[in-house]
Amino acid sequence: MYSKVFLKPHCEPEQPAALPLFQPQLVQGGRPDGYWVEAFPFRSDSSKCPNIIGYGLGTYDMKSDIQMLVNPYATTNNQSSSWTPVPLAKLDFPVAMHYADITKNGFNDVIITDQYGSSMDDIWAYGGRVSWLENPGELRDNWTMRTIGHSPGMHRLKAGHFTRTDRVQVVAVPIVVASSDLTTPADVIIFTAPDDPRSEQLWQRDVVGTRHLVHEVAIVPAAETDGEMRFDQIILAGRDGVDCLWYDGARWQRHLVGTGLPEERGDPYWGAGSAAVGRVGDDYAGYICSAEAFHGNTVSVYTKPAGSPTGIVRAEWTRHVLDVFGPLNGKHTGSIHQVVCADIDGDGEDEFLVAMMGADPPDFQRTGVWCYKLVDRTNMKFSKTKVSSVSAGRIATANFHSQGSEVDIATISYSVPGYFESPNPSINVFLSTGILAERLDEEVMLRVVRAGSTRFKTEMEFLDVAGKKLTLVVLPPFARLDVERNVSGVKVMAGTVCWADENGKHERVPATRPFGCESMIVSADYLESGEEGAILVLYKPSSTSGRPPFRSMDELVAHNLFPAYVPDSVRAMKFPWVRCADRPWAHGRFKDLDFFNLIGFHVNFADDSAAVLAHVQLWTAGIGVSAGFHNHVEASFCEIHACIANGTGRGGMRWATVPDANFNPDSPNLEDTELIVVPDMHEHGPLWRTRPDGHPLLRMNDTIDYPWHAWLAGAGNPSPQAFDVWVAFEFPGFETFSTPPPPRVLEPGRYAIRFGDPHQTASLALQKNDATDGTPVLALLDLDGGPSPQAWNISHVPGTDMYEIAHAKTGSLVCARWPPVKNQRVAGTHSPAAMGLTSRWAVTKNTKGQITFRLPEAPDHGPLFLSVSAIRHQQEADAIPVIVQGDSIELSAWSLVPAN
């Protein structure tokens, strides 16, 4: 019945990493065609915020325009989201490209193949040129082009170090050697740069093998093999399946991973069409994903048995089909063009992305990008999530928009005349983020990830007002946020943060103690989130929006700070202060008063629940102005005010101390109220009525029970004026601290929990150590030769005076049904809120030093304590069911013994 702002039960083990959100952005629309996209770091010493190179194959009538799209996020304080095209060359039927610093001058050069022909049935007999375009070190067009070599049908290439590390090498593989010839094997070629790559000579050419219908070449750099390999490994995907080539210092070696899709009569395509290597934990080759076959419809993954050696070449691989996307067409092709591995969610294990060209007729399943995530390492099970529904012929991964570790995704529509032409070909990026912004009329919807399941920090500035830049921040568990000491402030919306200074440790949660007041200023250079992560508003100093005191509304102009990568509709918004008398809800009140409102920001979770975290809006009032007494009888939320500027230093919240019926909000008697002054950069605690354990009281209409209350600016002569400015955070109902504060009788830690006296012969246990939700919690009798007592982590729930009890091995929480039922049996679960349970326990100590665990107080129920049943467990003679019972039962005390 009562929602909470904490993101997960406090002592539940760290949640698995969830995929981030993706902010789509058009890089280039209106293209004539589309085939290749590549993330291109302009300099060789940095891969952050790379440019993008994209192009199509072109036609006989129109050469392909090779363009570098300059990343607008590569420079700080850039206000544009436009990717400026720089033409590098015009080529005939270019296919693949890669890059390397060939000249060793610190700038990456482009390596590209062209003169392919219009299709596999039209291979240029004297084509298949491999060239490099020299980077001039500045954003200049028409880069100097030099030839590396030739081989008809040249289709894929990668730069690396395959037999030596002192110069750039290129592995290049044709797909076929002649028009319509699907049977003759093509050479696998290594080109090695000469001493002077700017000379006109061709590069040294070595043939290291032959393969059939190779559609994809990938490399595993030696630097990523944890010292296992001296040189880069080459992954080939073609009719022969998926295999690995590498040079061992003496000779070339081959390891066949798998043969891929089996051959079928009448189908010219079998084997594989694309492959990529995925890291799992400490193994750089935990799995190998594959698209099958040439332009196929099958997604497969190769796995190796548990305990196998790390890497590719010392393991035996087994193929598993994950998905088949629709039937093949009459030409035996489907919609899959590429697979790519990258750590999309930041958990240290790679996901893999599947590029889907599209279908005719259009098909949601076969268009865009799918992301496969490993969810069960033991059984190598994957989940599947749609990232984009825009045609994707190729995928490039990089961090395109920040200096962090997030992985963004770039795609280009597949549009090849005479084969498959997607409508409206375009290049797009999908920027990894924890926050998405969307315009809602005059307000903004900010959708955020669950902090406990993200591995990336996200900061989004959104408003500059009253001398502060307001920034929404999502912090993963145990994450650090650098701030400006004694200047920056934080208002926590979910989770916990803490910092330390010379006075000790300071913790902030969504609400301080009821009717209290607390500073938001951080007295340290950084703060850290707790194990559940945190979502907060960071107040940073601003030189744009003035400094208090604010003498007129002209000094309180609010500035839109949304970053360039959010939708233009959000960036174009104005956030005016509106006189409250002009708001439709004023109904004639506040006439001629210096009382203004600025709306507003909805913060919701970006999952299927779409649960509300808070609504945020700003208010300002001049000297002597009352914001009007009210009690939220028509809306249910818990409101916290965070003051940016207190004009007189005397403004704050007043609330009625008499029964509601005895208070006249239109003509208030201030002697019937109490005041809490809320100074600059302070927030007040809950003003709503709560039960003793911190749950909000509800009225008959399910609204939060508030006394009459109002913000009253300090009294005085408004000449000169001095405005109060505060931010209202309107939360759904949540639990807070107990009233009055109980004594702290228990130190969080790991314990064996024994029933009654510590020498008693029964201890708290989860049946069979079973992590399944709903597993009974028992009191196990100690028997000779039996197992040791199970260990439990007892943890204080931040922002409350309650505790949780989590099984040390499984993470299951000791839970009871909510609303509570007397004599109910207690069970272990990981998701109490979703199952109508509570995991909260109040803790007291009796005169013998024994502990009692009590459920939170609830309407129509007396105290209910964690206890044991008088009836033995039916299936286990040595077990007693654990239940909740009333306070008339003597058997409700427990003893705690520290455990390892």
UniProtKB/Swiss-Prot annotation:
Residues the record marks as active site: 155
Tree of life domain: Eukaryota
Pathway: Carbohydrate metabolism; 1,5-anhydro-D-fructose degradation
CC cofactor note: Binds 3 Zn(2+) ions per subunit. Two zinc ions appear to be catalytic, while the third one seems to be structural.
Residues annotated to bind 1,5-anhydro-D-fructose: 627, 630, 641, 726
Comment on pH dependence: Optimum pH is 5.8 for dehydration of anhydrofructose and 6.8 for isomerization of ascopyrone M. Optimum pH is 6.0 for dehydration of 2-dehydro-D-glucopyranose (D-glucosone).
EC number: 4.2.1.110
Binding positions (ascopyrone M 2): 627, 639, 641, 726
Region spans: Isomerase domain: 434-739
GO molecular function: 1,5-anhydro-D-fructose dehydratase activity; aldos-2-ulose dehydratase activity; hydro-lyase activity; isomerase activity; metal ion binding
Binding positions (Zn(2+) 1): 215, 295, 337
Residues given in the record as Zn(2+) 2 binding sites: 343, 345, 347, 349, 351
Residues the record lists as binding Zn(2+) 3: 630, 632, 639, 709
EC top class, as a word: lyase
Catalytic reactions on record: 1,5-anhydro-D-fructose = microthecin + H2O; 1,5-anhydro-D-fructose = ascopyrone M + H2O; ascopyrone M = microthecin; 2-dehydro-D-glucose = cortalcerone + H2O
Paired cysteines (S-S): none
Positions contributing to Mg(2+) binding: 101, 103, 105, 107, 109
Matches recorded under InterPro entries: AUDH_b-propeller, AUDH_Cupin, Integrin_alpha_N
Coiled-coil regions listed in the entry: none
Stored Gene3D superfamilies: 2.60.120.990, 2.80.10.50
UniProt region (Dehydratase domain), positions on chain: 1-433
Cofactor: Zn(2+)
Keyword set, alphabetical order: Isomerase, Lyase, Magnesium, Metal-binding, Multifunctional enzyme, Zinc
Assembly and interaction partners: Homodimer.
Protein name, entry field: Aldos-2-ulose dehydratase
Organism ancestry: Eukaryota, Fungi, Dikarya, Basidiomycota, Agaricomycotina
